[in-house]
Amino acid sequence: FGFLSERADFATVVLEAGLTWVGPSPQAIEKMGDKMTARQTMRQAGVPVIPGEEVEEEDEAAALEALRQASTRVGYPLLLKASSGGGGKGMRAVHDPADFDQAAAGARREAVAAFGDGRIYIERLLSGSKHIEIQVLADQKGRTVHLGERECSVQRRHQKVFEEAPGPTMTPELRNAMGQAAIAAAKAVDYVGAGTVEFLLAPSGEFFFLEMNTRIQVEHPVTELVTGVDIVREQLRIAQGEPMSCGDLMLRGHAIEVRLYAEDA
């Protein structure tokens, strides 16, 4: 379901069948699902984006040359990321320019195999950053709110292991700033429903847009426990055209979700 829920063509088919689609519009899914388009949209909305460059070339030789040139402008260390990526697929960290060509070719191959799209972009690798995600809700009446953050910095192979709310290092001022940025991100694509805006929080205190998940996520109960908001219920109300029933953000208590991973030895 997670894969289908973020496919714009699936949402379109559901709507064309005369059914109610519980989620954002196909247009919003498409804009946020393509990472390069999302970065460009966020820049236009005034949401801070990780320094980097998008490369639209699809021809392999031209793309690799464009990526090579972009790497000199972005600087090292850097991340190569698939525009249609997720779950760490098509992602490579590069610390030495001598390793760039091999990493870029490998990232493209993996992206094509996983997503059928070999487009790669470059981001500056922000070492020591925390991974913070903001839960948002938006109804069809024009109201968009955030429900605070979840910290998911502890990861294994680019997959989250711990989800914690509220974030242990978060301040009220930073929560408000990140929350307002998440709301701006949602409004930039006319978002409706439940979604998650992910940010990197640098050691300097600066934060940068990473991506938006255009669906409810498995970690949503963490937020429900500390806010008292039933996100699934709100999502269904929104899909029916009703206004959200939740009031101002009030955090109470602490919640942690832990994922178990089964791996080959």
Model-derived segments and spans:
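Generic alpha-helical structural context detector
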Residues: 12, 149, 224, 233-237
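ATP-dependent carboxylate-activation loops
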Residues: 217-230
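Peripheral (often C-terminal) accessory segments that flank ATP-dependent C-N-forming ligase machineries
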Residues: 65-67, 234-265
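Acidic/polar loop patches that form or flank catalytic/metal-binding clefts of enzymes
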Residues: 49-53, 193-195, 233, 242-249
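N-terminal beta-alpha lobe that positions the nucleotide/phosphoryl donor
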Residues: 1-197, 201-220
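Hydrophobic residues in alpha-helical segments
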Residues: 126, 226, 238-239
